[in-house]
Amino acid sequence: MSAKIIDGKQVAQTIRNQVAAQVQQRLAQGKRAPGLAVILVGVDPASQVYVGSKRRACEEVGFISRSYDLDATASQEELLALIDKLNEDADVDGILVQLPLPAHCDTTQVLERIRPDKDVDGFHPYNVGRLAQRIPALRPCTPKGIMTLIEATGVKTHGLHAVVVGASNIVGRPMTLELLLAGCTTTTCHRFTQDLEDQVRRADLLVVAVGKPNFIPGEWIKPGALVIDVGINRLADGSLVGDVEFETARNHASFITPVPGGVGPMTVASLMENTLSACQDYHDNAQ
């Protein structure tokens, strides 16, 4: 068996095209373009790359993109004041604070300061809570994008045994909630899990998000499983690999995401969807 490769770039492009078409429709109706404010604190190289891709995606779909690049020494108070200002700006539908923040910043306080109806990253406790209660509003972008990829395979999720490896607030925990909502029997593995191999071998649907290169041996993959690899790790030779041993895993799985070109593009595409949704669902009537 050789797995079908899930082309995240292609699926993401389809989503961006759909968003762009809806933006053009809005403009034709005399409505404004959705607006996204992106805040970057400091000069972390990886964060700069991610922010750049988000800003380019905004331009591609026709959003108004606003950039706020703060010095690494910017105080918590300065950052909160900027968020307060953007919360009240009627032309801003989404506010994104690029993580990680410098050590002196209180990330929880920052994320909670963003109005839930402008929380297009889906990290505010209100939005995570809605997902947990099966009434999702603005959903965390990476898990949302993963669900879109799974839907693109045509695989029916009801009754599948899903295993999530990694329990971060950004991916693992909300991913577990998404899979429960999709009808899976879901297991979440983390650093205290003692029988990781046994859990992985039982997975009909495996999502791995730990940030460790080739952490899951390909031999562990259940024959016919659907494998979603969220990790993106740079090796000493400069090559990029995921958290799953790809070449071996693809001989066991039915579907697998590549690294790069799998989950990454979907995160940005989901951000575009969320920003459009925030504009249409929450802010159009407030104009």
From Swiss-Prot:
UniProtKB keywords: Amino-acid biosynthesis, Histidine biosynthesis, Hydrolase, Methionine biosynthesis, Multifunctional enzyme, NADP, One-carbon metabolism, Oxidoreductase, Purine biosynthesis
Give the residues the record marks as binding NADP(+): G166, A167, S168, I232
GO terms under biological process: L-histidine biosynthetic process; methionine biosynthetic process; purine nucleotide biosynthetic process; tetrahydrofolate interconversion
Q: Does the keyword Cytoplasm apply?
A: no
Q: Which PROSITE patterns match?
A: THF_DHG_CYH_1, THF_DHG_CYH_2
Pathway in which this enzyme or protein is active: One-carbon metabolism; tetrahydrofolate interconversion
Q: Which GO terms describe its molecular function?
A: methenyltetrahydrofolate cyclohydrolase activity; methylenetetrahydrofolate dehydrogenase (NADP+) activity
Q: Which SUPFAM superfamilies match?
A: Aminoacid dehydrogenase-like, N-terminal domain (SSF53223), NAD(P)-binding Rossmann-fold domains (SSF51735)
Q: How does it assemble?
A: Homodimer.
Q: What does this protein do?
A: Catalyzes the oxidation of 5,10-methylenetetrahydrofolate to 5,10-methenyltetrahydrofolate and then the hydrolysis of 5,10-methenyltetrahydrofolate to 10-formyltetrahydrofolate.
- Record protein name field: Bifunctional protein FolD
Q: Which organism is it from?
A: Aeromonas hydrophila subsp. hydrophila (strain ATCC 7966 / DSM 30187 / BCRC 13018 / CCUG 14551 / JCM 1027 / KCTC 2358 / NCIMB 9240 / NCTC 8049)
Gene that this sequence comes from: folD
